[in-house]
Amino acid sequence: MKTAVTILFLLLAGLGNLPAQTPHDPAEVELIAAIDRSASAIRSLQCDFTQTKELSLLQDKMVSRGVMYYRQEGGKLHWEYLSPYTYTFVLNGDRVMMRSSGHTDVVETSGNRMFRQIARIMMHSLTGRCLTQEAEFDTQVRAEDGRWIATLKPVRREMRQFFTEVRLCFDPGRKLVTRVELLEESGDRTVIELKNIRTDVDIDEKYFAVD
C-alpha cells in the first residue's frame, strides 16, 4: 500500500516553507522543459511494470509485477499488482479505490489534502510532469550513459516520511519515464521498471471504475 501511494511511483501542500532550487544550467533547464512538454502531451499511457523492494535489514528482494493504465483527462490512474499477490489502486478524479483480497475501500480525496496531493504527484511522477513542481521538490536533471536521470528530493517534511529521494530515468528518444527509484529514510529502496510502454491508446473505462 505504501509503495503504491508514494510512487511515484509519486505524492503536497504542506507545512514546510523551504524554498526549492531553480536550475541555472541551460542544459538542465532544456531537459526539464523537453520532458514537461512531452508529458503534457500524453493523452493516455499503459504499461507493464516490475517492482523490486530491497529492505535494509534483509538480504532478500521482494519482486512483484503488474500493469498500469493512465488517462490525462479527468486525472485517472489504475495501478494493479498481479503477482505474487493481487492489489489494485484506482484514482478517478477525487475518488480513490483500493482493493485487496476481495476487500474494497473508497476514499474521497477532496476531504483529505495529503491523500489528494500524494495521488496527484503519483501520476505526475509516472509521466515526468513533477519536474516543474518547484514548490514540492529540489530537482536536478542530468544526461548520463544514454539516459536522462532526474533526482528529486521533497522539500516538505510530511513527504519525507514516505521517501527521502526519487530518481526517475527517462528514455531520451521518447522522453518517457522507464524507471522509478524510491529511497526511504530507513535505507529501504524500491525500484520500478516500466516496460511495454504505449502512449495515446484507447483504454477501456472499466479500468478506472471506482465502486
Predicted regions: what is each one?
Residues V5-G14:
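Bacterial N-terminal signal peptides
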Residues L18-T22:
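Boundary at the C-terminal end of the N-terminal hydrophobic targeting segment
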Residues S40-G93, M98:
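N-terminal mature ectodomain segment of secretory-pathway/periplasmic proteins
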Residues T50-T52, E73-G75, L82-Y85, D94-V96, ...:
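Solvent-exposed coil/turn segments that connect beta secondary-structure elements
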Residues D60-R65, T86-T88, T104-V106, F163-E165, ...:
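Short, mixed charged/polar active-site loops
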Residues M98-H124:
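Acidic/charged, solvent-exposed loop-and-adjacent secondary-structure segments enriched in E/D, K/R, S/T
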Residues V107, C130-D211:
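Gly/Pro-enriched, hydrophobic low-complexity segments
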